[in-house]
């Protein structure tokens, strides 16, 4: 585990299991969305049929067993909790009980821009997922607590949060085409002087590219 091929291998394995499960089931889910080994499923055939489907799912492979949560009003999938109440649907940020929120420590030797971008990017994530002002404020408060516990100072946190607050949530929910990156990466072994070396090399490369 931990190698680059692990997610792809797991996805192929679960894709085969998923296909065998759905093709052999007498009753089909209304919808089925899977990300590697996490599944969001909508069921409309009754409780007895659901129990039979789940029992069948756990019989497909001898060592792969599905744990499940069943609810008519609230369900969590990946990092999102969706709640339906009085005909309205809201979304909230979901964190697993095992999540320790171990954000990159400011005491590490990573470039400074990495630490500045984390409060901003995580605040954007909160703003995108949380559909109400109340839950957004609550999750940003949680995020501030986790970041301070990891050693982030108030100035860096507030700067990232302020920058995120200026972005309209509607724009965050729009699909954006991914740009093709044609840059050739320069991969170097880490060295404490890399930042200084970058400051020297970057202007030289910039001049060469303009010619």
Predicted regions and their residues:
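Charged structural interfaces that engage phosphate-rich ligands
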Residues: 1-211
């Amino acid at each position: 585990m931990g190698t680059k091929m692990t997610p792809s291998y797991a996805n192929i394995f679960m894709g085969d299991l998923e296909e065998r499960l759905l093709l052999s089931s007498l009753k089909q889910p209304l919808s089925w969305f899977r990300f590697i080994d996490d599944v969001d499923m909508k069921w409309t055939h009754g409780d007895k049929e659901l129990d039979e489907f789940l029992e069948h799912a756990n019989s497909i492979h001898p060592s792969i067993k599905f744990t499940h949560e069943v609810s008519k009003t609230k369900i969590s999938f990946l990092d999102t909790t969706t709640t339906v109440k009085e005909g309205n649907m809201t979304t909230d940020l979901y964190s697993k009980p095992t999540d320790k929120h171990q954000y990159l420590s400011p005491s590490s030797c990573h470039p400074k821009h990495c630490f500045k971008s984390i409060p901003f990017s995580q605040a954007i994530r909160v703003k995108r997922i949380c559909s109400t002002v109340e839950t957004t404020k609550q999750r940003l408060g949680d995020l501030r607590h986790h970041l301070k516990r990891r050693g982030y100072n108030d100035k860096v946190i507030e700067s990232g949060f302020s920058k995120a607050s200026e972005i309209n949530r509607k724009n965050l929910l729009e699909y954006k085409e991914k740009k093709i990156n044609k840059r050739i990466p320069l991969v170097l072994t880490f060295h404490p002087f890399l930042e200084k070396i970058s400051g020297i090399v970057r202007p030289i490369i910039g001049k060469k590219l303009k010619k």
